[in-house]
Amino acid sequence: MPKEFFDVFPTLEVNGDMKKLLSETEVTKVGMNHEKDHIRIYLNGTRLIHKKNIYQLEKNIHDQIFKNRHMDVKVIEKYQLSEQYTAEKLMDLYKDSILEELKNYSLMEYNLLRSAKMEFTGDSHLLLTLENTIIAQTRSHEIVEFLEKVVCERCGLDLSVELAFE
């Protein structure tokens, strides 16, 4: 059963803006592995939280709650966004956060996406134009998968990505 974030973590201290955002989220699940050194916290919210703030939240939870233990803290966020959001509007607002996350995942894919041209030909149809290199051609499908995972699974919006190279 979902609980409000600060009902699950009542002693956690975070900065003012983050406190407001987290007060509007719910924790839907907390899971730990058998070795008890990895914890996953599943958040559900209606307002976007930048990935750098999620990383800071993971650090705060680790430092304040698990300070004397080796614990890998992972926050997995999911959003129920209002009808005003389209994939195009989401990309305008959330692109920096997407790039931040991709940078932590793969520097090569981050650089490819950062330098790519993104053009929406419809609310949920993205033409992604990458530099015509062997690296871009071999890694482009990972970028598409990543974008679809963030936009479709995390944010609940439709996105169709068409690749082009120039």
What are these model-predicted stretches?
Residues 1-166:
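Intrinsically disordered, low-complexity basic tails and flexible linkers associated
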